[in-house]
Design a protein with these regions (language model features):
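Short amphipathic alpha-helix that is part of the acyltransferase structural core
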Residues: 1-22
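Conserved beta-strand-loop-alpha-helix junction that forms the acyl-donor binding cleft
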Residues: 98-113, 117, 125-128, 138
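Active-site rim helix/loop that mediates acceptor-substrate recognition in acyltransferases
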Residues: 15-38
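Conserved acetyl-CoA-binding loop-helix of GNAT-fold acetyltransferases
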Residues: 72, 78-91, 110, 114
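Conserved beta-strand in the GNAT
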Residues: 38-40, 46-55, 66, 71
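A short, internal acetyl-CoA/4′-phosphopantetheine-binding micro-motif in the GNAT/acyltransferase core
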Residues: 67-78, 101-103
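A conserved beta-turn-beta hairpin within the catalytic core of GNAT-like acetyltransferases
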Residues: 56-67, 77
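Short glycine-rich, basic-tinged beta-strand/loop micro-motifs
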Residues: 90-100
Length: 139
C-alpha cells in the first residue's frame, strides 16, 4: 500500500507523516465494510498488484462499483496482468461502474480506455487532470 501511495504522489499532492508514511484513510474499511471489496492480484504465488472497489461516486451518480484503487507493481507491468485482472474484476462484478484516472497517468489512461471500450463508456472530465469513465457491463 505504501509503495502505491508513494507512486501516486506523481499525480496527487499527498503529504507524508513524520515517519515518511502516506495514509489511506479507508484502507481498513476494505476488509471490514461489506460495501467495499479488496482484490489481491497474483501470478501463481506471487503478489503482482491489487484493486479496491466501493460504491461511492466521483460524479454524484449511483454506481454499483467504483474502481477506487488499482495497481500492478512496476516490475510486473507490460505483461498483461493489468488487462487480465481488470477484465476478471469487471466480469465478476456486473452493474453500473465508474473508473477515474489522472490524465497525466498515461498507463492508467491507456488501460482503462482499452478495457472499457466494449462497454461504450460515457466520459466525464471532472477537472483539468481527472477523467471518469461511466458504463454498465450487464452483458
Amino acid at each position: 500500500n505504501q509503495k502505491y501511495l508513494y507512486e501516486m504522489t506523481m499525480y496527487y499532492p499527498d503529504e507524508m507523516d513524520e515517519q515518511g508514511n502516506y495514509h489511506y484513510g479507508y484502507f481498513e474499511a476494505y476488509f471490514t465494510d461489506a460495501k467495499r471489496k479488496a482484490f489481491f492480484i497474483y501470478d501463481e504465488e506471487t503478489l503482482v498488484g491489487f484493486a479496491m472497489l466501493n460504491p461511492y461516486s466521483y460524479i454524484e451518480h449511483q454506481p454499483d462499483y467504483t474502481m477506487a484503487e488499482f495497481t500492478i507493481f512496476p516490475v510486473y507491468r507490460r505483461k498483461h496482468y493489468a488487462i487480465d485482472a481488470a477484465d476478471l474484476i469487471l466480469s465478476g462484478n456486473r452493474g453500473k461502474w465508474e473508473i477515474k484516472y489522472n490524465e497525466k497517468n498515461m498507463g492508467a489512461k491507456k488501460l482503462w480506455t482499452r478495457v472499457t471500450k466494449p462497454y461504450a463508456p460515457v466520459v466525464y472530465h471532472i477537472n483539468d487532470e481527472e477523467t471518469v469513465l461511466e458504463f454498465t457491463n450487464y452483458y
